[in-house]
Amino acid sequence: MARKGSIEMKAKEGAFYAKILLFGEYSIMCDSMALTIPYSHFQGELSFIHEDKYTDQEFAEESSQSLRDFYNYLHNINERGEMFFEFDLNRLKLDIELGMYFESSIPQGFGIGSSGALVAAVYEKYAVNRILPDSSIPSEKLQQLKKIFSKMESFFHGVSSGMDPLNCYIRNPLLIKPDSSIKPVGIPREFSKSGGIFLINTGKPGKTGPLVNLFFEKCKEDEFFNRVKNEMIPFTNQSIEAILKDDFKEFFSKLRSLSGFLLSNLKPMIPEAYHSIWQHGLDTGTYYLKLCGSGGGGFLLGFTEDIKAARQMLKSRDVEIITVS
């Protein structure tokens, strides 16, 4: 259960928030811990084109076509006997024919779970005997949901861990351990009276597939893989452990090391225009940046002990921030 004063989300049934992977991008593929949170600034829900919604007609029609393609994927894996969960595919097909689409403010390709929210919404509405979301849900149920969501979201990414839809569906911070166990956790809303988490919009979407492939190719090099194992993973795990213990002196120490590692070793994942901005945070200690998802564009994730100072410093470099917590 999330403790008092921690990040947790409550939303009406049918509405699904974006998610932010605070820690674990790339390193989770090499068995690090990971920590993910819901982000209520963006959300989406299934709707119908004829309803009075803010989405323009063109977007709604494109979204409806995407849902049609998603239905075909689900239908095909069901026909092949690969769907190990029961769906009301007939009702899904009928609703798509009636003009259903995904009404969403979650930007696509920005690393905050646009497809995850859609998958969670479809599961909630059309799964038969679905597992109900709850912050105290047993670990075995979380694993079962993760497996289901992995199969569903693979339509969008080719391969999916299922973590994005799981976070969108549970609406609670989740800790993923190296043994793949998952549990809801409580994390503080604020690092201090003046600190916080923020996003930077790089202005263009990223492409997950090519960057993930690049990381795997780099991991075939012994020198790079050893750095991942001996530096990136410990910095990630130690950052997570510190934030969960409210030890913010330790947290910012390990976060600085992780941020420096990312800039030195994963530069292709960081838009070139932000290399100097990233380094400036490391040099001054006013803020520290890291990837938000696979990178290459989308959002960057920032942490600071003084949100006002970070905002002013970044604004002087023509960078606006979006506060997360």
Kindly give the residue locations of the regions a language model identified.
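Detector for intrinsically disordered, low-structure N-terminal pre-sequences
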Residues: 1-4, 121
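Stable alpha-helical structural segments in soluble proteins, enriched in small hydrophobic residues
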Residues: 117-129
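C-terminal nucleotide
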Residues: 3-23, 27-29, 36-37, 44-96, ...
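Gly/Ser-rich catalytic serine loop of serine hydrolases
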Residues: 105-117
